[in-house]
Amino acid sequence: MKSLVFCSVLLICGVLSAQNKDVFQSVNELVKETQRVISIEKGQVIDTAYFRTLFLPTAHFSMVGQEDGEFMQETMGLDEFLATLTDEYYSNGYHEAGMGAIVEEYNGMAQVIQSFEGMDSENETGKGVNSFQFVYSEGRWWIANMVWAMSYDNGKDIPRKYLKKN
């Protein structure tokens, strides 16, 4: 019986490992995985250890927005960003999903510009645009940087080309 349980556990771990490896072979799947990991229900926590594996250790995260009519940006490194994901703000849940995207790839580098919609822990909904930059190294895709901006009129200002499904 013990050997049956042990074999079952090994099989399950092997399947999960294979599924996770597939995520790193496609920039589209890597974007979806990023959003899957940060989308949590009330009472859940984001798996920041796994989230870290999606990104280069040197990745940067930048949010662009307007304040008093002036464009502003805030940029942080991977460790700083992971710390924000453990904030109490997320304790009531968070959800983000892609609406459409443009994917460009060349010679080991790629970019995905994606429109998204989300709902935060306070049930506020919003739409915006993410820009992911990728590099292919060590047999897989890595997210090198991520930049995002929120829409100011519930997505009506998002260019149509970013709303088209791949």
Describe these PLM feature segments.
Residues 42-71:
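N-terminal, post-signal-peptide region of Sec/Tat-exported proteins
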Residues 23, 61, 65, 70-121:
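Surface-exposed, charged secondary-structure patches
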